[in-house]
Amino acid sequence: MDLLAPLSAVVLTYREVSAEALGKVGQEMKRCIERRARAFPMYVLHTCSRVEAYLYGAPPEEVQEVAEAYRRYVDSVRVITGAEAARHLFRVAAGLDSILIGETDVLGQVEEAFDRQVRAGYTRGLLKTVVERAVRVGKRVRTETAISRGPRGLGSLSIIYVSRLLDLRQAKAAVLGAGAVGSGLAMELASRGVGKLYILNRTFEKAREVAAKTGGEARPLTREEVERCLRECDVVFSSVHSMEYVIDRVPEGASVKIVVDLGVPQTVAPGLPVKVVRIEDLRQVAEQYNAERAAEVAKAEAIVEEELAALPRLLARRYVEETVAALLETAMTAAEEEGARAGCDAAALAAKTTVKRVLLPLVEKMKKMAEDGQMEEAVRLANVLTQAVGRKT
């Protein structure tokens, strides 16, 4: 039984379309996961350079419907299935599919999306295991190779870009957003000795937390405070998730000279009377560092393949564990019902004891089989036992 076969991914990246188009698709996928994830597990990764929807156990027609939702905005959509879908997610988490090879920001974004969607109940079951393993791959790659040495991500590249246009040590800077990208921006600006730093976030406590680490000043992310920063600062970096423009005008007499848009989707309106730096402007800077990191790519790819080879065994073990938990729950409920019918607590206790005595050795045997690589046999036995007690897997 191939437990990777039910995995599908619908993928769109910066290579195929503009950041503006990615933003529109990202909005559609937010609505899509809210509608569909109750029926089957889903995981959506939306960053400034990609929108990817992962589904587990969805019928082919459902996967195609998700792909069609992408095609309302763009034609260049890829559908990947099985082990290839897992490999793609592992490479994304490792930074191997990024504008800047080995960037660390994307790993934080993978984790943020995962945590949020697990809490919402969207990412669960074996899909949860796949994404957890992708995070592990990303951490291993950055620990065991030098692929992330230097700029950490698009935020770092944007700071390098801006530093060629003005002296950051004499500048006032604001960072809108305190997530993975925003907090990274703030930390790097502080390390470069920026003249004055402001951190704005919708959750003010998060802004205060980042400000405390960077010596910056926390402000709430409101329209009034954004305009205040535009009036006071030389450069403003936007890294927020927003379905509307966060910056759509520049106040008269504002000090701002440069606005950097790393938002998801684009959060800075076109046509502003200042220099706006967008992701497309950072590709040339990225190419320089990608050449330096090329020697580490093979090492990172080897880690991806090693973890991918181990994934089927891990999924089999998790599948057995989940099936066994459901099996025991069903059996214990049946024992309680029998005891209740007998009208005797002692009878219920005896029934539960019998269930444990009969099933636990089989449970341990199935787990051991999965751990020893007898994956198909373990899964088959789990299914047989589950069907025997009347629960379909």
From Swiss-Prot:
Molecular function GO labels: glutamyl-tRNA reductase activity; NADP binding
UniProt-annotated binding residues for NADP(+): 177-182
Reaction catalysed by this enzyme: (S)-4-amino-5-oxopentanoate + tRNA(Glu) + NADP(+) = L-glutamyl-tRNA(Glu) + NADPH + H(+)
Gene3D superfamilies to which the protein is assigned, alphabetical: Glutamyl-tRNA reductase, N-terminal domain, NAD(P)-binding Rossmann-like Domain
UniProt keyword list: NADP, Oxidoreductase, Porphyrin biosynthesis
Function in brief: Catalyzes the NADPH-dependent reduction of glutamyl-tRNA(Glu) to glutamate 1-semialdehyde (GSA).
Record-given protein name: Glutamyl-tRNA reductase
Native organism: Pyrobaculum neutrophilum (strain DSM 2338 / JCM 9278 / NBRC 100436 / V24Sta)
Primary gene name: hemA
